[in-house]
Amino acid sequence: ILVQRVSGDNYNKDYYPHIAGVGNSSNLYVWDENIDMNAGMLRMVFGLGTRAVDRTVGDYAKIVSLDNPLRIPPINYKDQRKFSQHYVDVLSLEQNKLITKSIDELISNDIKADKELFATIDQQALARMRELGLDSSQAPYILDFKKLLGKTKFPTLMRDILATLSKVYNYPVDIEFTANFKSDNSFKINLLQCRPLQTRGLGKPVKVPELT
């Protein structure tokens, strides 16, 4: 039995890390011919890593290609919010159990870090609210991690970690990690697990029958 301390901090009676996820030293999500597989990839979420490991209906983890962290899949701008993370798993210190909260509920509180590292205002929703004369201060956020991936050393450091571990293992690796940030944008990465990356391989070639 392996018992590990939960990585994170206390935020208004909730406990969670700013970022949690899994990383592969070989990118298995090659949806663009320009992606460098050997640069690695991350599948990460805000809050506890349960949503990065377990599939959730209608909620999506952030897929990061470490050769170009700001590269996004070919989706319409209006779909960016749809295909993003909407809910966050946290440990409730008050209820002493795992609970789920909306990202807007959490991000509106003090998270002891620059919230713009992780989320940006949904500009499309903001414009619509202004058209309708609604309170624009309540505009929803999109968890796009844009500032984190474009303005900090986090993606470069994660790429170096994966490359170093893969070199030592002499084999592609799969890791689980968390990251916690401070108000000055400094951060600490916690490596929770590391193991050889399991894949099925290419298998045998299959001959496709011709249509007659």
Identify what each model region corresponds to.
Residues 1-212:
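Conserved mixed alpha/beta core segments that line enzyme active sites in large multi-domain catalysts
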